[in-house]
């Protein structure tokens, strides 16, 4: 199972390119409603039913579908597809690259994680050795920037990122 939530609508891809059996996407990352998502399942993969009952979702999950959420997700996905086709995310990537260059030039010692490789256009990961994340977040907030010291799904955790550790970064 691959979490495609951040990439969906921001970079061109087709599920069959990825070589995974299942992929998850969420509407709220596209500006759609919270609480609605999609599980894309490769043809031939059998999933056991999670809730027994009616034949909704091809027998995989019984219960009334969230039609308003589905419609909101569809509208957000269509808007995201238009933005992608119109080059919006290319412009966002250019702005990210400018910010990254300026940080490297002015904030001595910062490390840009993922520089030089394909990555999401709207995400910049910067490490600043010797600075506590909480201190950076407060200072940047006071300066008018919205940053975080980790992902929203990891908020409240005090251990190092497994991904950054696997990439060779220290805690």
Regions found by a protein language model. Give the residues of each.
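Pyridoxal 5′-phosphate
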Residues: 1-171
